[in-house]
Amino acid sequence: LREEKMPALSRTLFDEYEINGNRLRYEAVYFKRREFLSAFGLASIIWHKKEDIQKLEYVIGEICSEGCWALSAHVKRLEDPNWRMTIDLTASETGHTLAQMYALLQDELSEETKELIKTEVSRRILIPFMKAKAPAYCWEDATNNWNAVCCGNIGSTAIFLLEDGAEKEKLLSRIRYAIETYYLEGFGADGACTEGLGYWGYGFMNMVVFAMDQRALDPTYDLTAFEKTEKIAHFQEKCYFAHGRTISFSEGSGKGKYPMGLTCCLADLYRDIRFPDPVYARGFTGDRCWNWNELYTGWRWTKQYLEDVENGIVEAPKPLAGAEVEFLPDAEWCILRGEHNTAV
């Protein structure tokens, strides 16, 4: 990427969804730009090379100059005069990505870049959210992955950028309420995600990222200590079989790639988490959206877990269980696994 030119977004591409329903051409460029942001952000955090920092600052400037951080398919330009401030999955992710880079690279980013991040993230994410009366957004009281992704990213963004005080606590209290009351209640007591395994990983990862950030800020509030959270954490291992085959109910795929960073974090938290075969973990280039949370935690949480294993703090990774029958009464799923992890 160091020698590659960052592609430009255009009004023509953005308009295509309204004109002919095509969202993919715009998104291809949008996510390529997020590849630049995530790749140079992670490289800067790991290696601290001047050339990467300089390229990252250029990329941040480009991201902050975008007219709208939301995807074209998620805005309503004819109905909403403030459509450029739409907060969707990718807008909240972009805000959090920039906020975390601000926090982790404070001593290396220029004052100009840091001020740009604070200004744009506040203008596009934090201020609109704080001004709107809850539940102001369709995802704020949703029981699906949108709630966890948007609320989790906004919460983490506030932790990184807002000064401690009443304003920050009011926002975080609103986020905690939304996640507890709606997202977690979208799961039954059996912890199954009826949206499918892929959306389990997407939503739950973002919730856990916020939970860990919130716990670091205030150890007295710990979403990961909830009994239901632990039940949800075990869902992935119930859905994997031999050769990477997975349960394909709902929007799930018949073959999946799992988030290693999230799995390692859960193994650090709950001890009895089981790992699918590592060959089926999603690699650095496995996510077309270049989601910052997955890429950063894929490095950070995996590294932390391996260090904890080496130091005897936690047990070594456990493989999937052998032959067993798993009944998830709330989802009404019965899962049968053969002796060699084959689906029955």
Report residues per predicted region.
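Low-complexity, Ser/Thr/Pro/Gly-enriched N-terminal "stalk/linker" regions
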Residues: 1-18
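Short, functionally important structural connectors and interaction interfaces within domains
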Residues: 6-9, 185, 320-323
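Low-complexity, intrinsically disordered regions enriched in charged/polar residues
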Residues: 7-11, 95, 115, 119, ...
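Exposed boundary/loop context
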Residues: 14, 184, 189-191, 291, ...
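Aromatic-lined, polymer-binding surfaces characteristic
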Residues: 27-240, 246
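Carbohydrate-active enzyme catalytic cores, enriched for enzymes
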Residues: 204-344
